[in-house]
């Protein structure tokens, strides 16, 4: 965890409790205590990195030798118990479990499954899948100050999302946002999101590559976003119009 990087992403570290849990058991112990304290949000990053009990000697924290930890389904078994306990203990907390996808062996076709077993999915209210391409063609590039020169570098990438499973509303809703990891803008591009949503709702007109924003015209999405970043009062007006149509 980097407090400096978190701050750039908009995290208020003064209101954050950080616990470096390394095992599924540690995660459950800490999460239950936080739930009992009625903490609003808990984020586990990630359940894929947590070790199951099979990695440790009985009644101790000493790691076993690698050859003694090869038990199929050990992580899924422990995560099944974990989500049951967390579900029972939870009264008002939003619990976000971040996972990673793995290749599924033995399948006729290429397929990916999240770690932690099926219980994680079925105990969840909503499952959102995120993915992004590292291809050069999909990278977001911009000029970055390096010494006394401006050099074009990769500064971000588009991220796709889809609601894969949902107990609270319709599934299969999808979308995309831009994430910046370098340059003057760090994190999710909320300005670009306002532009795209306003266009979809007809608040902003677009013809070909031209955008019309409050009677001002711009060629290209990048120019339109640049204008909005320099005119936050226009962003505020667009947000009010968007909320008025929801």
Residue ranges: model-predicted function:
Residues 1-81:
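Conserved inter-motif catalytic segment of the P-loop NTP-binding fold
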Residues 209-246:
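Terminal-proximal interaction/regulatory segments of ATP-powered molecular machines
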Residues 189-223:
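Long, well-ordered amphipathic alpha-helical subdomains in the mid-to-C-terminal portions
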Residues 72-201:
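Phosphate-binding/switch region of NTP-binding enzymes
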